[in-house]
């Protein structure tokens, strides 16, 4: 599988190369809100080809109340969801014709969790386009803490009209 080692191997797209998005701009793209918006900022956006989002994990996260008392660990499924949110924001930001559309998470393949994510960690979600057949996109995604890979997965998503979603 394609491993994302650093920012130098991420190819630039035509419209959004070098862009960043703050949480307010992310909320204009994604329907997610607290406590389920799991990315704080897009720190690098290279068209639809790739991007990097940031999540600063704090002890105040609601999921730490039960996962696990006395030894808080961010659930792996939420790392995957944050990867999917990163990819979704990239697709929606890159294509102006996607206004009024939602990104639905379709698939997870090759998921691996390598190290726990704990309060105080800054998690960087790197995503890179593998395949595009609109309305379906596939991305390779990795989560990194302190420059080390903590999780990875191949994720698939589909764009649908917001009105069709019900």
Predicted regions and their residues:
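Beta-strand-rich interaction surfaces with strong enrichment in secreted/lumenal proteins
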Residues: 27, 70, 113-115
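Hydrophobic beta-sheet segments that form the core/acyl-binding groove
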Residues: 42, 108-146
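Hydrophobic beta-strand-centered segment that forms part of the acyl-chain substrate-binding groove
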Residues: 2-3, 11-20, 87-124, 150-152, ...
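Mixed-charge, glycine-accented linear interaction segment located at domain edges/termini
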Residues: 132, 136-138, 142-166
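N-terminal leader/capping segments at the start of a protein or of a new domain
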Residues: 1-38, 44
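Catalytic strand-loop segment that frames the active site of acyl-thioester-processing enzymes
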Residues: 33-74
């Amino acid at each position: 599988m394609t491993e994302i080692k650093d920012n130098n191997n991420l190819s630039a797209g035509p419209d959004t190369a070098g862009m960043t998005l703050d949480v307010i701009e992310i909320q204009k793209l994604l329907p997610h809100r607290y406590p389920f918006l799991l990315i704080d900022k897009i720190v690098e956006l290279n068209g639809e080809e790739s991007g990097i989002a940031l999540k600063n994990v704090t002890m105040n996260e609601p999921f730490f109340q039960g996962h696990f008392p006395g030894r808080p660990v961010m659930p792996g499924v939420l790392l995957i969801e944050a990867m999917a949110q990163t990819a979704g924001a990239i697709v929606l930001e890159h294509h102006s014709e996607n206004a009024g559309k939602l990104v639905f998470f379709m698939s997870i393949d090759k998921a691996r969790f390598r190290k726990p994510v704990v309060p105080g960690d800054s998690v960087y979600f790197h995503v890179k386009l593998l395949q595009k057949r609109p309305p379906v996109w596939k991305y390779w995604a990795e989560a990194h803490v302190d420059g080390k890979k903590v999780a990875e997965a191949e994720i698939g998503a589909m764009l649908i009209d917001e009105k069709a979603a019900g």
